[in-house]
């Protein structure tokens, strides 16, 4: 996949940053939203990420596995749909990255001209490099794993939260079906958006820079966040 020059955020968007979008009326500004996303937001009366609420006008809290806690300002935002991520990106004058851009930022080492299996290199994931395997039961604060950064300095690209991309889930050129074709092939070209990077709940043996996940644009999964590109 070819990419031209682009910039990618060094970290996923945080709760602190996303709260500014909420407080600036981002959920009321139709011009920021994809038309289908605006219709969904109106029908569902969406005003903030899933499980966010205000116990009083001055504080935001969230629910995590049935427990209520203050919003963790420097943790990656979660419970946002693709439409919400896209609207936020427009609000900050950016966009969501394509999956090719995301993969290049995670994989390419410009000093050697080679691709890495993981952002930090080809060594297997461990607790110093990424938040995986349900060990923390939540994402860490952004930047908590400097040893896991990519050659370009982007952190948190493996683990913590899956990340929305701008790309539709479709077959690569020359794709040949896995023997279990129902794993991915039947989902191609049906409106799914590509997710990359794994989450804090992903098994280490199941993730790599090239792994593709997917979901509907309206889904607000617990384990999904995003970062922006420009």
Q: Where are the model-predicted features located?
A:
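Functional-site microenvironments in short loops/helix caps that host divalent-cation chemistry
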Residues: 1, 11, 27-209
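Short, structured beta-strand segments at or near domain termini in extracellular proteins/domains
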Residues: 222-230
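Short proline/glycine-enriched turn/loop segments at secondary-structure junctions
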Residues: 183-187, 213-220
């Amino acid at each position: 996949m070819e990419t031209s020059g682009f910039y990618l955020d060094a970290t996923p968007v945080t709760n602190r940053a996303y709260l500014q979008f909420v407080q600036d009326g981002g959920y009321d500004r139709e011009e920021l939203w994809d038309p289908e996303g605006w219709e969904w937001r109106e029908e569902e009366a969406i005003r903030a990420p899933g499980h966010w609420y205000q116990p009083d006008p001055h504080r935001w809290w969230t629910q995590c596995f049935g427990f209520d806690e203050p919003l963790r300002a420097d943790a990656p935002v979660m419970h946002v749909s693709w439409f919400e991520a896209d609207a936020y990106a427009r609000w900050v004058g950016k966009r969501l990255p394509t999956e090719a851009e995301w993969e290049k930022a995670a994989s390419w080492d410009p000093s050697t001209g080679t691709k890495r299996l993981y952002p930090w290199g080809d060594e297997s994931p461990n607790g110093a490099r990424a938040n995986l395997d349900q060990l923390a039961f939540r994402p860490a604060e952004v930047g908590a794993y400097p040893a896991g950064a990519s050659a370009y300095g982007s952190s948190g690209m493996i683990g913590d939260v899956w990340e929305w991309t701008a790309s539709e889930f479709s077959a690569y050129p020359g794709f040949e079906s896995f023997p279990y074709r129902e794993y991915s092939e039947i989902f191609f070209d049906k409106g799914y958006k590509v997710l990359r990077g794994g989450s804090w709940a992903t098994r280490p043996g199941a993730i790599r820079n090239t792994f593709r996940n997917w979901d509907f644009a309206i889904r607000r999964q617990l384990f999904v966040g995003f970062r922006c590109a420009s």
